Amino acid sequence: MSWLLTRFMLCALILIAQIIGKPDLAPSAWVRRLVTLFDRAPATPFDTVQLVLKKELGQSVGEIFENFEAEPLGSASIAQVHRARLKGDKSDVVVKVQHPGIQELMMTDIRNLQAFALYMQKTDIKFDLYSVTKEIEKQIGYEFDFVREANAMERIRRFLYENNKKSPVLVPRVLKDMVTRRVLVMEYIDGIPILNLGDEIAKRGINPGSKIAMTAKQNILKSMTLAYGQMILKSGFFHADPHPGNILICKGSEVALLDYGQVKDLPDSLRLGYANLVLAMADNDPIRVSESYRELGIDTLSKCENELQELLKFAQTLFDTKLPPGVVMLQPFSEDSLIKKIAVQAFPEELFSVLRTVHLLRGLSVGLGINYSCAEQWRPIAEEALYLAGRLKGTDLKPRVRKCRLFRRLLGRE
């Protein structure tokens, strides 16, 4: 059982890596090392995997699969995935298998994280970190139920495919009769991990700064941004874990989004409140930012003279992919840190998933070498969401949003 002991020691490290292993939160040298942990956790031995599959699916590996690769494609903190092919089928599938005993280990790590959060709140960092760890506890708790994950994957797949002529991202199809709490079988999507994109570009002899390379990167970011704008602002139900290990780049710069263990279903009040904050950030409107904070239930206490401008800067630091002028990296311990200037006394637990998602998108944009504002890109979706909720008049919409609505009416879609 030495593999289980090794896993116990590494679980906390992997959690930390996935939280801070982004270019805007840590030096690049750290990031290069931390991101390797996204899908390289210790693997469960194959004989144990076979026992889990037999118990969960009721048949042995040989009875179900034509072939089954013993070496996993990747192993993360909760599960590992294997490539396989079902008997009588010509298409490959991915089999996700939960590590035995991992739930108890992970929840122990979370409790330790909560104790650390309570300690940190006694320092100069006046941020409601404990609420954040409570949301992490809830979200990670959901990840141990693969039936829930399969339902989430199907719901998001249906939403994106039905609301777009072509879905901005690929979502694997679930094999519904091969899902249990600990095993999930889904469609195999061929692609390269986004972490290997730079190597793939170099292998093809393409200059990373060339027009063709930058166009490919822009298309990748455009796809991710559109998908997340629609999920968060239009649906409220979204994939909440877009770290590099969950993103594949497919033929033609198409993007596949994997692993739906962490999803979030925002209540309409928070979805529309965040839509209002998106418009405030896109317009650099400090008064609207302050109003949005109150609507979202973010309780702040400012320790600076220029309160409204600092609140705007704080919002853009937390909830936009483009950092405001003068902010290069989040540095909570520096003397001029925004977290020290603005004490966050209350922060809605459910909003943490939005914050984390935006920060992961920011890390993606920095890694691709593209500085952009998701708030500006999401403006049309936010305006439409508020309009449909009766909170904006047609005359308040930007011209491109009015034009999109006109097209939908002509096509009979509303």
Where are these regions (language model features)?
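Catalytic-loop of the protein kinase fold
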Residues: 234-244
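Broad phosphate/nucleotide-binding scaffolds in NTP-utilizing and phosphate-metabolizing enzymes
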Residues: 1-231, 236, 250-254, 260-268, ...
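Hydrophobic residue at the +6 position relative to the catalytic HRD Asp in the kinase catalytic loop
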Residues: 245-249
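Short amphipathic alpha-helical recognition elements used for nucleic-acid or partner binding
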Residues: 274-276
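Short helix-adjacent coil turns
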Residues: 281-285
